[in-house]
Amino acid sequence: MPAGMSDAAGKTLADFKAPYPEPTSQQRRYVIFLDPKGDSKELNDYKVELIPGRVEKVDGTNVYRMGGNIEERTIDGWGYPYYIVTLTTMSGTLMMPLGDAALKRPRFVAMNTKNLYRYNSRLPIVVYMPKDGELRYRIWTVKSTGSGTAKSTKAREM
């Protein structure tokens, strides 16, 4: 394997031969392939945070959040999970922006989520998003008792 390449690089959803549903005309399907870490570490030391959202034109002063829901479903007869995201309205704080901060620019506005999902390199994480949505995710790692770190990544559409 070339240096810098992950074990997950180059995988496709078809490699898993599971009947994941096709996205509807109003959806995009994102697929996340995770690198193997070892069964015990995956179970105890790693978690995945899904960060759905949408790029919106917003000012640089206020804090914005997207409303919505993440629903977990399973493939009948297989037990493989997949997720359907619904995005609703955006809300923000009401501070008065001044100067350059008042300029509206395209920025990713994340849905407020609190769930962490099991890290399992044997199965892809399949997420169906609205067409105008975007999915990012974080891999959380335990460093020691009571502390951890996270690395954010943009998910791949398939």
Curated annotation (Swiss-Prot):
One of its GO terms (molecular function) is serine-type endopeptidase inhibitor activity. Pfam families: Ecotin (PF03974). Gene3D superfamilies: Ecotin. One of its GO terms (biological process) is symbiont-mediated suppression of host complement activation. It comes from the Eukaryota. Belongs to the protease inhibitor I11 (ecotin) family. PANTHER family: ECOTIN, PTHR35890. This is Ecotin-like protein 2. It comes from Leishmania major.
